Amino acid sequence: SSDSINPYKVARHKEINIYADYDIHGGADTLQLETYENYNIYYSGKLRYRPKALADAIFFEKDSIYRDLDRIRTYRQITNLNTFKYPNIDFIADSTQTGLETNIYLAAKSKYSLNLNFDVTHSNIQQIGTAFSASVITRNVFGGAETLNISARGSIGLLSDASLSDETFTSELGGDVNITFPRIWLPFNTESIIPYYMLPQSRLLVGTNFQRNIGLDKRSLNSILSYNWSPTTRLKNNIELLNVEFVRNVNPDNFYNVYGNTFSNLDDVAEPFKDDSQYASYFEEDDDGNIILQIPDGANDFANDVLDGTLSVDDEQYDEVNSIEERRQRLTENNLIFATNFAHTKNSKSGINDLDFYQYRIKLESAGGMLSLLTNVIPYNQNDSGQYLVFGVPYSQYVKTEFDYIRHWSIGGGQVIAFRSFSGIAIPYGNSNNIPFVRSYFAGGSNDNRAWNAYELGPGSTDNINDFNEANLKLALNLEYRFPIAGNVKGALFADAGNIWNVFDNETNPDAIFSGFSSLGDIALGTGAGLRYDFTYFVFRLDVGFKTFNPAKDGSDRWFDGYNFKRAVFNIGINYPF
């Protein structure tokens, strides 16, 4: 006898049946049928989904050859809709083994769901806090598998540095209305560019936030129209076509109470005038009997009189007062940001237990460009500085780009070497000569250079001159060795390098300005160790950092100055920093 090999038979989809709101206990004879583009849609009662929304999630086509890729894509897209439970798909071959009856069974998730969350939080301002949030999710809002999420949140936390404010605690309240569409929501068809297997989504968000923290306090209102899609399981793209944010400082008169170093510098300039009675209106007596500038009116009037020539000071003092006043105006003025950005992310991680992977993220952002183009059409008002105003607020105009790279190497036994690099720059132009505080960069803190507190490092070789130091250029490098100790307790050794600088803006201090390769000598280095406890859902982290190289010091004092626990910086964090 001779062996025979059966030839491979190509199978094609002959019938494609979609069972919407499938109930395993329901009777087939009660189902109704609607046909849409060669798809048979079975349902009972009333069909709650638009046929197109169902068909767009199915990648099998009548008379097309069966491909396992289509099966995988169908599972992914149906799951991505967040409207159905994990689908059940079966294939029934006919007598020739070349024709398939393809059945997709869809069981709906609950129309409504309520989520309540309690989290332990950490931020640049608060050392540790608690956050509460509640959200109501409504699925299939308009019959096209849309998801509406209405959420509210609140938090209270302990200030990371008691000297930042007279208050001990911070608080925050906010809320969002967020609707997601499982397609690109534009007036033209984008399917040829972004097909449905890329899991396209459109998101419209409106939110508000009330923040009470370091004294200035903020209220913000933001609106976002964004689109995201995933060409592969490892690639993700996001476009925020419109990102509008309005930030209002509630207590601008509290500036000099919050920025104590800035106030001290201004008060030093005012020292020669304190004994002259004709300038008594600038000053008051503090609790210790010292004569100081009165906050806010005395300090503001003194600065204005110096700058308009009413009071005579030397050139160095004039520059100091001018820098202080520019900073005060920038940090207390309200911000209006109309931005568009694009982010591209790749992550090679294959699963939650994959300890050997890389991830990179590129982001490009532009703000104010569209409003600038409309200046010849819309008669904007202008302020005294010549800036154009929208709703009485100067709009921000800048371009910004960032690159973030993370690499993890597994070296066995639960040990990991983790590396991160970050670079970012934001360049103001047109209607702005600086970057809004909410879009600028800072250095230090539990997720950055852990040998400095947040906002304490930089810019450049300056020595924490502004209390909350920020700038528009940032470079950062982090290296960490992670290892198990016992059970859920883990340890780490780390080195953090980086700094922030001013560039292409109105900063005049040469020590704060990036001037080329020579400025790389201002990169700070912090080293230290940490303990972590893995609670499964989150990791509690305690790191201690030492200033190994401090660019704010002079000469040999830059290295290992104060390398002891008395001058160490202790950081509490939630989850890994990268």
State where each predicted segment sits.
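Outer-membrane beta-barrel "beta-signal"
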Residues: 533-537, 564-578
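C-terminal outer-membrane beta-barrel translocator/porin domains of Gram-negative envelope proteins
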Residues: 25, 31, 37-40, 121-125, ...
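Periplasmic polypeptide-binding modules associated with outer-membrane biogenesis and secretion
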Residues: 1-121, 153-154, 158, 423-424
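Outer-membrane beta-barrel pore domains and translocons
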Residues: 61, 92-94, 107, 119-123, ...
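Transmembrane beta-strands of outer-membrane beta-barrel proteins
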Residues: 114-116, 146-150, 200-206, 223, ...
